[in-house]
Amino acid sequence: MIELKNVNKYYGTHHVLKNINLSVKEGEKLVIIGPSGSGKSTTIRCMNGLEEVSSGEVVVNNLVLNHKNKIEICRKYCAMVFQHFNLYPHMTVLQNLTLAPMKLQKKSKKEAEETAFKYLKVVGLLDKANVYPATLSGGQQQRVAIARSLCTKKPYILFDEPTSALDPETIQEVLDVMKEISHQSNTTMVVVTHEMGFAKEVADRIIFMEDGAIVEENIPSEFFSNPKTERARLFLGKILKN
């Protein structure tokens, strides 16, 4: 379980997260939505120790993150898929996938490569194992990044707007891979996204944020058909109209 307890985050005098209380259960698919600047990405980055909270606690598997232990804990339990793919350009796809398992988890090359081939097949890129990232489309690179996160076999995968940097033509291929993972895997997924169709289909629970606060928490069927708050209704009215 990942828990945020009374989490506040400031950038200077700017209050970015305001008393966030949130728990993510094992195996849950949690989707965080809201307008730009609402604190969604900061929330998920706090979960992974990429941002230090100003006050409150972040707890991962009953371990409270602090500046001394956060790297060790998050490396053990959390994988992250970013807006931009962060693949090593001088390494092949296969080398990108086997680096962390071999270096950090001390897997043998044989075991790491077997796992890499398994997940390249899952994301539909088995034939791209020996090419370099620059030869791939944006959608393909993001699918490689997802496969890389799966190769670490960590219990939590956090997705920070994984389709926002993609061309419209390649967004669906990434969403399809994420849907497949959500249906076949017991992995806990936390997804920040503007893709409402994906949220409706995949999420066990929706978190709607605005101005650094959680405004509404609901199951998808209720949130999209009958949101509890006026702000959520206005947001959905605008975004679904487009």
Swiss-Prot record:
<keyword id="KW-0067">ATP-binding</keyword>
<dbReference type="GO" id="GO:0005886">
    <property type="term" value="C:plasma membrane"/>
</dbReference>
<dbReference type="InterPro" id="IPR017871">
    <property type="entry name" value="ABC_transporter-like_CS"/>
</dbReference>
<keyword id="KW-0472">Membrane</keyword>
<dbReference type="InterPro" id="IPR003439">
    <property type="entry name" value="ABC_transporter-like_ATP-bd"/>
</dbReference>
<dbReference type="InterPro" id="IPR050086">
    <property type="entry name" value="MetN_ABC_transporter-like"/>
</dbReference>
<keyword id="KW-0547">Nucleotide-binding</keyword>
<feature type="binding site">
    <location>
        <begin position="34"/>
        <end position="41"/>
    </location>
    <ligand>
        <name>ATP</name>
    </ligand>
</feature>
<dbReference type="GO" id="GO:0015424">
    <property type="term" value="F:ABC-type amino acid transporter activity"/>
</dbReference>
<dbReference type="GO" id="GO:0016887">
    <property type="term" value="F:ATP hydrolysis activity"/>
</dbReference>
<comment type="function">
    <text>Most probably involved, with PEB1, in a binding-protein-dependent transport system for an amino acid. Probably responsible for energy coupling to the transport system.</text>
</comment>
<protein>
    <recommendedName>
        <fullName>Probable ABC transporter ATP-binding protein PEB1C</fullName>
    </recommendedName>
</protein>
<dbReference type="GO" id="GO:0005524">
    <property type="term" value="F:ATP binding"/>
</dbReference>
<dbReference type="Pfam" id="PF00005">
    <property type="entry name" value="ABC_tran"/>
</dbReference>
<keyword id="KW-0997">Cell inner membrane</keyword>
<feature type="domain" description="ABC transporter">
    <location>
        <begin position="2"/>
        <end position="236"/>
    </location>
</feature>
<keyword id="KW-0813">Transport</keyword>
<keyword id="KW-1003">Cell membrane</keyword>
<dbReference type="InterPro" id="IPR003593">
    <property type="entry name" value="AAA+_ATPase"/>
</dbReference>
<dbReference type="InterPro" id="IPR027417">
    <property type="entry name" value="P-loop_NTPase"/>
</dbReference>
<dbReference type="InterPro" id="IPR030679">
    <property type="entry name" value="ABC_ATPase_HisP-typ"/>
</dbReference>
<comment type="similarity">
    <text>Belongs to the ABC transporter superfamily.</text>
</comment>
